[in-house]
A protein has these predicted regions:
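A short, glycine/acidic-enriched catalytic loop
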Residues: 46-76
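Loop/turn elements at helix/coil->beta-strand transitions in domains of secreted/extracellular proteins
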Residues: 1, 31-36, 62-63, 100-101, ...
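Catalytic-core regions of hydrolytic enzymes
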Residues: 1-53
Length: 153
């Protein structure tokens, strides 16, 4: 696992994917065995009172959502179908283990740098209204789901 903590959205959010393209491409070049890339962050919704959660056991957990880029905007993105299939596989396992952990998958016309790797996706963890505790709780369940899915790939 490679955890990149670079702040690609500083100084301007509008160019964050241009900046992250260079960083992710460099990481993939330096780590040829990397097959899966997740862009994990909170959903930047202007309404900071919106905080999607689900109760798992006794915990309030931020709901997550896959955002999958495509070639719908005219940019080359040959592996978007593979990325979507992989997200569906993860989401199906999550629904089996922890119903409600994920909101429905969103398919977009932008690439979000997902053209760089098969199995690439955005995982939005809650929104700006969720607490850090709710988001960290989600990571615990996401790691269990990924562990089961990756054991079968």
């Amino acid at each position: 696992v490679i955890h990149d903590t670079t702040l690609y959205d500083y100084p301007s959010y509008n160019e964050s994917y241009d900046r992250s393209l260079k960083g992710v491409a460099k990481m993939l070049e330096e780590n040829k065995n990397t097959d899966i890339v997740f862009d994990i962050h909170r959903d930047a919704i202007a309404d900071s009172t919106y905080a999607p959660t689900v109760k798992i056991g006794d915990e309030e957990v931020a709901q997550m959502m896959f955002v999958i880029g495509s070639n719908g905007g005219g940019s080359e993105h040959d592996n978007w179908n593979d990325n979507l299939k992989f997200a569906i596989k993860i989401q199906e396992k999550a629904n089996e283990l922890y119903p409600g952990l994920f909101k429905p998958i969103i398919l977009r016309n932008s690439r979000y740098n997902q053209q760089l790797a098969r199995g690439a996706s955005i995982i939005e963890v809650g929104s700006t209204g969720n607490t850090m505790e709710q988001c960290l709780n989600s990571m615990k369940y996401l790691s269990k789901v990924l562990s089961e899915v990756l054991a079968t790939v």
